Amino acid sequence: MAETLITKPPLSLSFTSLSSMLPSLSLSTANRHLSVTDTIPLPNSNSNATPPLRIAIIGFGNYGQFLAETLISQGHILFAHSRSDHSSAARRLGVSYFTDLHDLCERHPDVVLLCTSILSIENILKTLPFQRLRRNTLFVDVLSVKEFAKTLLLQYLPEDFDILCTHPMFGPQSVSSNHGWRGLRFVYDKVRIGEERLRVSRCESFLEIFVREGCEMVEMSVTDHDKFAAESQFITHTLGRLLGMLKLISTPINTKGYEALLDLAENICGDSFDLYYGLFVYNNNSLEVLERIDLAFEALRKELFSRLHGVVRKQSFEGEAKKVHVFPNCGENDASLDMMRSEDVVVKYEYNSQVSGSVNDGSRLKIGIVGFGNFGQFLGKTMVKQGHTVLAYSRSDYTDEAAKLGVSYFSDLDDLFEEHPEVIILCTSILSTEKVLESLPFQRLKRSTLFVDVLSVKEFPRNLFLQTLPQDFDILCTHPMFGPESGKNGWNNLAFVFDKVRIGMDDRRKSRCNSFLDIFAREGCRMVEMSCAEHDWHAAGSQFITHTVGRLLEKLSLESTPIDTKGYETLLKLVENTAGDSFDLYYGLFLYNPNAMEQLERFHVAFESLKTQLFGRLHSQHSHELAKSSSPKTTKLLTS
């Protein structure tokens, strides 16, 4: 394989040394313990007497307008100001727009809502004409980092102003897919609220806005928020940006896990890099999390490469180099970097029988399953339900499991093969398939028996079958793109990929192959006919990347937090699904898919590039701050 050039960041910066460059955000006030509030009761029908709030939004970009739409719908009075001209959007929403901050502040809003970016908030606070506002005005921020915001607000606001630090854990994109704010988390910390009834009531009235929309209200200290957010939010954004850099696109054989990653990449890439950089710089915990991701990915690569090294050494010493299966390098074409879809290879499988009906006598098959573990039992259950006769064999004893499913179990392969099954399904692992195939007593079977595999890689079993099976045996390579977990509620609309590698020309053999495929069509599977090479091309992008991300996250030992975002919940679900698979499966996807190595290296290069972006910008910012704080003489030296 051609050597891949990996560009390292041109900075001599370690994670440890970088920590000294991040802001030190020591807090002068004690942090509250984490507490998740009960839902605040919705106001009763007589609560309309409560006057609406006069809310000024500073920063009327996408997010400010997003919040304004709901605030207006609830009857509150809104003013807005932004550096850019958003007067047209304000008029459309029914918001009074001001180009001059002094004019806005002289309207004496009850609440000032800061909807600025993380990077610009300090400059905004420095320019606000606080003297134009009423004393004790409530200031609210909605930043994704909270210790930083709290520290700035305490530093710049007059002492008689109230402070409420909040983080709506959602935005326009997540609300659109969720159809509203219901069930989405709203995190807040009452940093400084005066004891007078009016000020307490005003704060509660503001929080009530989000309660009315069905948000899950979570009260916690800003310190706890940032600790949890470094995992849930920063990891989600890091993985989303990595996937976006890989330029993955939908394929004809998407799994549910891969579709979730595509959605994540689409959502995250809609955010600016400034937001991601702000999460990195202004959350004290993010640098440690980035280092953990780095170490986890290196550990995963080392685990794969060390196993590969061991296999090659073993084969070399035993003089069995013939067992190393070399495939054409499909990665030479530059188009592979964009995972271009070849839709012309996808053939729609036509099936006209009634879904899930039992088969007639003429279509009933006698099927032998070799390898009766979880996946073999999973398939056998449906085949028996449809009226097929199922026989099974495995190295381990599954007699009891077979009896429960109505499957005839054999402890001797010769005995099973002498029953002359029409179809043999190999449900073995990728790594054991060759050894199992070489041990089969083919002479006990009828000539022209149909052999089927269900492996997650396809060129490898295709070549193995053609090399090992007698020439008068039929070959059908398949990949059910689901398993016991993803298919536990039925197979409807789940992809079943197949390639009729070698099917005899007579009607009986064609009919037998179609009867086998009908098993999956009857259950509502999306039948996709494509070549083994095309399958492996797409699977390297979809399946291997999905398993790589799942394995990477598993090494981070992620846990649910009180402030999980929808994106983070997607990652947790992915870990749950992939962690149930053995490492042998993942290693098999890597070893026997000729495109997997290229994808692993692309992931590595993308991660290095992302770190370069972060550290390069951090280094530039640090140099700029040094230049600003230097004497004129030093500044001249730095800039010359």
Curated annotation (Swiss-Prot):
InterPro entries xref list: 6-PGluconate_DH-like_C_sf, NAD(P)-bd_dom_sf, P5C_Rdtase_cat_N, PDH_N, Prephen_DH, TYRAAT1/2
Transit peptide: 1-18
Pathway: Amino-acid biosynthesis; L-tyrosine biosynthesis; L-tyrosine from L-arogenate (NADP(+) route): step 1/1
PROSITE patterns: PDH_ADH
Gene3D superfamilies: NAD(P)-binding Rossmann-like Domain
Function: Involved in the biosynthesis of tyrosine. Has no prephenate dehydrogenase activity.
Protein name listed in UniProt: Arogenate dehydrogenase 1, chloroplastic
Organism: Arabidopsis thaliana
